[in-house]
Swiss-Prot record:
Protein name: Potassium/proton antiporter CemA
Keyword Chloroplast: yes
Membrane topology: Multi-pass membrane protein
Domain of life: Eukaryota
Classification via InterPro entries: CemA
GO cellular component, as recorded: chloroplast inner membrane
Sample GO molecular function, one term: antiporter activity
Compartments, record wording: Plastid, Chloroplast inner membrane
C-alpha cells in the first residue's frame, strides 16, 4: 500500500506541474513589473547621483531583468512540456478500479486532456482495454464510489455548459448495483476554476512579455546585453532610443582611478545626497548592488576555474588520449618527439648496458662464456624494448598535455573576451574588497605576496617550478636556462612592484606604504 501511495504522490505532483510552473512564471512577471517601476523611481534621482552609481544601477537592474525573463520562458516551457506528457498519458487511458474487483464493468474516467487542451467531453471507457491495466496502481487510490449519475457530476454539467460543453447526451451505467469510481484529487469544479486561473496567468504573462518588448524597444534595451551611456539630463531618457546607438559610450562598472582619491569623491557625493534628503532611498539599492557584485564575481571566478577543468579532463580521457594513441602508433614511425628525449633514452640505454655488462663480468665463467654472451644480448634487447615503450608513452603524454593546456587556457581567454562586463564587475568587487581592509591587513597581504614571489627564499621554488614545467612540456632539464631565468625574473618583478608602490599605492593610500616599509624593515 505504501508503494501505491508513493506512486500516487508522484502522479499527483506531476499533474500539478502546469499549475505550479504557471504560478512561478506569473510571479516572475510581477517582479518584472516591479523592476520597471523601480527604474522610473531611480530615474528621478539621476541629478543627485554620481555617474558611476547610475551606471551600476542600470547594470544591476538589467541583470535582474534578464534573470526573471529567463525564469518566465523556462516556466512556460515546463508548463507546455508537462501538458504534452499528460496528454500522452491520457491517450493511453487511465483506469479506475478497486482492489479485488474484476475488470468487467465500465468505469468513469476524467479525461486529462479536457482540463489542459480544451477537449470538451468526459469519457466513459471500458476496463477491458488491455492498455489500461498497467495504470492499475495509480487508479485504485483516492477513489470514491458513486451510483449512476453522481451529484458532483450533475453540478459540474452547469460549468461545462457555460464553457460550451454538451452534457445532455451523456450515457451512464443503468445497473444500480454497478459502481463507478471517479479518480481525482480535487472535484471537477475546483479543477475548472484552477484551469481558468491558469489561463488568466498565462494571458497575464503574455501581456507582460509583450509590454516588456515594447519597453525595451523604447529604451533600446537588449535581452542579454546592455550598453550604458552617460547620465541623462532632465527630460531625457537614461537609455538611448533606437537610432542613437552610435552615440552610446560603453563604460565600466567600477570607479576609474583619477588624481583625486575615490574616497573623497564618494564622501562628497554622500554629503550631497544627505543634503537633498534622498539617502534613505539609496540604502536598499546599495545593499542589492553589493550582493549582486559579490555573487556575480564569485560565479564568474568559479566558472573560470571549474569550466576549463570540467571540459579538459573528460576531453583528455575519452577523446584526445585514444585519438593521439591511434595517430602516433599507426601513422607515425618515430618514437621520440624531440632531440632531448632521444638523448635521454641513449644515456639511459648506455647505463643499462654498462650495468648488465658489469654483472656478467663479475659472474664470468670460462666454461660458459658463449652462453653468458647470448644472455647479455637478450637482456640488452629486452631492456631496449622496455625503454622504447616507455619513451613512446612519454611522447604521447607530452602531446596530450600540450593539447590539454591549449584547451585549458583557450576557454578562460574566450571567457575574458566575451564576458568583459562580468570581468569589470569582478574587478570592481576585488578593488572594493581590498580597499575595505585596514592598512595593516593591506600591507600584510602585499608583503606576503612579494616575499613568496620575489623574496630571498624564492629562487629554489622558481627552480622547481621551471623544471616541472619543462618536464611537463617534454623538454630536458637545463640548469643554465633555469639559473638565467631565476637570476633575472625576480629582479624585474621587484622593480615593477616598487614602481607600482611609488606610482599608484603611494597616491591612493600613503599610510599603506608607511606600514609596508615598517613591516618590511
Amino acid at each position: 500500500m505504501k508503494f501505491k501511495l508513493y506512486w500516487w504522490e508522484v502522479f499527483r505532483w506531476f499533474s500539478d506541474t502546469p499549475s505550479r510552473s504557471s504560478e512561478r512564471a506569473c510571479e516572475a512577471s510581477r517582479q518584472v513589473q516591479h523592476i520597471k517601476k523601480d527604474y522610473v523611481s531611480y530615474k528621478c534621482l539621476v541629478p543627485s547621483l554620481p555617474k558611476h552609481s547610475w551606471q551600476a544601477i542600470i547594470l544591476y537592474m538589467n541583470t535582474r531583468l534578464n534573470n526573471f525573463v529567463f525564469i518566465i520562458y523556462w516556466s512556460v516551457l515546463e508548463c507546455k512540456t508537462s501538458i504534452y506528457l499528460l496528454n500522452i498519458l491520457n491517450k493511453l487511458g487511465l483506469i479506475v478500479s478497486v482492489p479485488g474487483k474484476s475488470f468487467s464493468s465500465p468505469k468513469l474516467l476524467i479525461n486529462i486532456r479536457s482540463f489542459f487542451n480544451g477537449n470538451k467531453r468526459l469519457r466513459i471507457m471500458s476496463q477491458s482495454n488491455p492498455y489500461n491495466i498497467w495504470l492499475y496502481p495509480l487508479n485504485i487510490l483516492l477513489s470514491f464510489p458513486v451510483h449512476r449519475k453522481p451529484k458532483k457530476l450533475r453540478s459540474t454539467e452547469k460549468i461545462f455548459e457555460k464553457n460550451g460543453f454538451n452534457c445532455e447526451n451523456r450515457e451512464y451505467p443503468h445497473d444500480k448495483n454497478d459502481k463507478t469510481y471517479f479518480v481525482s484529487g480535487k472535484s471537477s469544479e475546483e479543477e475548472l476554476v484552477r484551469i481558468e486561473r491558469m489561463n488568466q496567468k498565462l494571458a497575464w504573462i503574455e501581456a507582460t512579455l509583450n509590454d516588456l518588448d515594447n519597453w525595451k524597444r523604447y529604451y533600446s534595451l537588449s535581452s542579454f546585453s546592455f550598453e550604458m551611456g552617460d547620465i541623462p539630463e532632465e527630460g531625457q531618457s537614461s537609455l538611448s532610443v533606437e537610432g542613437e546607438s552610435d552615440s552610446i559610450v560603453t563604460t565600466i562598472a567600477y570607479e576609474s582611478i583619477g588624481l583625486v582619491p575615490r574616497s573623497i569623491t564618494r564622501t562628497l557625493s554622500r554629503f550631497k545626497t544627505e543634503l537633498t534628503g534622498q539617502s534613505s532611498s539609496l540604502v536598499l539599492y546599495e545593499f542589492r548592488l553589493a550582493k549582486y557584485q559579490a555573487l556575480a564575481s564569485l560565479q564568474y571566478l568559479g566558472c573560470l576555474i571549474l569550466i576549463p577543468w570540467g571540459i579538459s579532463f573528460p576531453s583528455e580521457r575519452w577523446l584526445l588520449k585514444p585519438w593521439i594513441k591511434n595517430w602516433w602508433n599507426i601513422n607515425q614511425f618515430q618514437i621520440f618527439l624531440n632531440y632531448f628525449q632521444e638523448e635521454r633514452a641513449s644515456k639511459r640505454l648506455q647505463e643499462v648496458e654498462e650495468l648488465l655488462w658489469l654483472d656478467e663480468v663479475m659472474l664470468a665463467d670460462s666454461s660458459s662464456s658463449e652462453v653468458q654472451s647470448q644472455d647479455l644480448n637478450r637482456q640488452i634487447h629486452d631492456k631496449t624494448i622496455q625503454l622504447v615503450a616507455m619513451y613512446n608513452e612519454d611522447s604521447i603524454q607530452t602531446i596530450l598535455h600540450l593539447l590539454t593546456d591549449i584547451i585549458y587556457f583557450a576557454i578562460p581567454s574566450a571567457s575574458f573576451i566575451s564576458g568583459k562586463k562580468r570581468l569589470a564587475v569582478m574587478n570592481s568587487w576585488i578593488q572594493e574588497s581590498f580597499h575595505s581592509l585596514s592598512d595593516t591587513m593591506k600591507a600584510f597581504f602585499i608583503l606576503l605576496l612579494t616575499d613568496s614571489c620575489i623574496g630571498f627564499h624564492s629562487p629554489h621554488g622558481w627552480e622547481i617550478l621551471i623544471s616541472s614545467l619543462s618536464k611537463h612540456l617534454g623538454f630536458a632539464h637545463n640548469k643554465h636556462i633555469i639559473s638565467c631565468f631565476v637570476s633575472t625574473f625576480p629582479v624585474i618583478s621587484d622593480t615593477v612592484f616598487k614602481y607600482w608602490i611609488f606610482r599608484h599605492l603611494n597616491r591612493i593610500s600613503p599610510s599603506i606604504v608607511a606600514t609596508y616599509h615598517a613591516m618590511n624593515e
